Regions:
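Membrane-proximal intracellular helices of multi-pass ion channels
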Residues: 1-423
Length: 423
């Protein structure tokens, strides 16, 4: 037991080392002279982590711990093998060039490793504290504080940021409100914007859901307490298959965001003004689906670069609506459609009515349709000779009206200057 406890303390020590490496790597710029020794340090750290995890795997007495450690080992082996392949493929180049090539692989792998370890830590919190409400609120508070300090790192902003502004931005990102006190596009670097989008993603899905997503793969170690916490967060009716439900939420969310990013990319691929097009697409896909409203463009969607890109705006609207409805409503509706289609072509039950869609789904869908259609018609009529004059086509006017009807559902985006709108 003492040996197991010592290994756990060493595990936490290595977690701190990994965290420090990540923070200093992304948060500070030490110049070119530091790059090569830094990459060598990342390689040695990865080798050290692999050695320690291997030792823990063969000395651990708990089967559940072995599953977690095995995943860590596989991840570290993949990182090092990829580094080795890159080294062999570029062996004719200088060592400095090769080290710069493998640096992103090491950084990305160690970040993923740390996230896995963070999920284990959160699950440990579940076990020692039972109150789901406290765990829920506490996870958001911790996420906001961590995000605030990360946004204050030198490489996260162009000219620095106060703690108050960092705290406000982090809170807005985690709570997906879209409110900002600084310009996300101007005052934050790509590092800062990446921190913001991670906060949006964790806040939108919930760190508890992400934790349960990983727990699905280690089901022998998932606890009754953890099941209760997860059930409350994802609004699941019971404890049966609660971790599978969390898995479905995460996979559905990430899948929709990836597809949305691809469609957004197709809408801006010919736009020479927008840099880092796939990053732009992924950022706005996550921001739209989570109803956050953050943008990497100065002025947001009101920017002339995309203000008249109606294809982009319809994609964002669809993402906002899907994210705003929530996974329970979307899952129930798709289950209804699937069952209806199956029974439609099944001659044995062709006259049987499908009664799967819930009352909650009906209320939400009908209310959403009424608000969106009614809002679009009202804005089209009331703003036709005011803000809609800048749109030359009827389709453009309809798109602008629909976008302004959709975004008030906590999305935060805006393609119209509200100060110019009629009373």
């Amino acid at each position: 037991m003492k040996k197991e406890s010592l290994l756990n303390y060493l595990y936490r020590f290595f977690d701190i080392i990994v965290l420090l490496f990540i923070v200093f790597d992304f948060g500070y710029d030490f110049g070119e002279n530091y790059n090569s020794p830094h990459v060598v340090g990342l390689i040695l750290l990865s080798l050290g982590l692999l050695t320690f995890n291997s030792f823990k795997f063969f000395n651990s007495t708990f089967k559940s711990n072995k599953k977690v450690v095995l995943i860590n080992m596989i991840l570290l082996i993949v990182i090092l093998v990829n580094c080795g392949v890159i080294w062999l493929l570029n062996s004719s180049f200088s060592v400095y060039y090769i080290l710069q090539k493998i640096k992103p692989v090491l950084e990305g792998g160690l970040i993923l490793y740390f996230l896995l370890r963070l999920m284990v830590f959160v699950r440990y919190i579940y076990d020692i504290y039972f109150n789901p409400a406290i765990v829920f609120v506490g996870s958001f508070m911790i996420l906001v504080l961590i995000g605030s300090f990360l946004l204050m790192l030198p490489s996260a902003t162009t000219n620095g940021i106060t703690f108050t502004n960092a705290l406000f931005t982090a809170t807005s990102a985690v709570c997906v409100t879209g409110l900002t006190v600084v310009d996300t596009a101007v005052d934050f670097t790509i590092v800062g914007q990446s921190i913001i989008i991670v906060l949006i993603q964790l806040g939108g899905i919930g760190i508890l859901t992400f934790t349960s997503f990983f727990a699905f793969f280690f089901r022998s170690s998932s606890s009754f307490k953890e099941g209760l916490n997860t059930r409350d967060f994802i609004a699941n009716d019971g404890l049966k298959d609660v971790f599978r439900a969390a898995l479905n939420v995460v996979v559905f969310t990430l899948g929709v965001e990836l597809v949305g990013a691809l469609f957004i990319y197709s809408s801006i691929v010919d736009n020479a003004i927008i840099e880092h097009k796939f990053y732009f697409s992924l950022f706005h896909s996550i921001s739209a689906f989570c109803n956050a409203g953050f943008s990497t463009l100065p002025g947001g969607i009101l920017n002339t670069t995309v203000k008249f890109n109606y294809y982009l705006q319809w994609i964002l609207m669809l993402m906002i609506i899907l994210g705003g409805l929530g996974h329970n409503i979307v899952f129930n509706f798709f289950h209804y459609l699937k069952t209806y289609c199956f029974e439609l072509f099944d001659k044995k039950v062709i006259h049987k009515k499908v009664r799967i869609i819930t009352l909650n789904t009906k209320i939400v869908l009908y209310t959403t349709i009424i608000l969106l259609v009614g809002g679009t018609i009202f804005l089209f009529i009331s703003e036709y000779n005011i803000t809609l004059l800048q749109h030359d086509t009827v389709f453009g006017k309809i798109t602008a009206s629909a976008f302004n009807a959709v975004t008030p559902r906590t999305a935060g985006f805006s393609a119209t200057d509200y100060g110019e709108m009629g009373v």
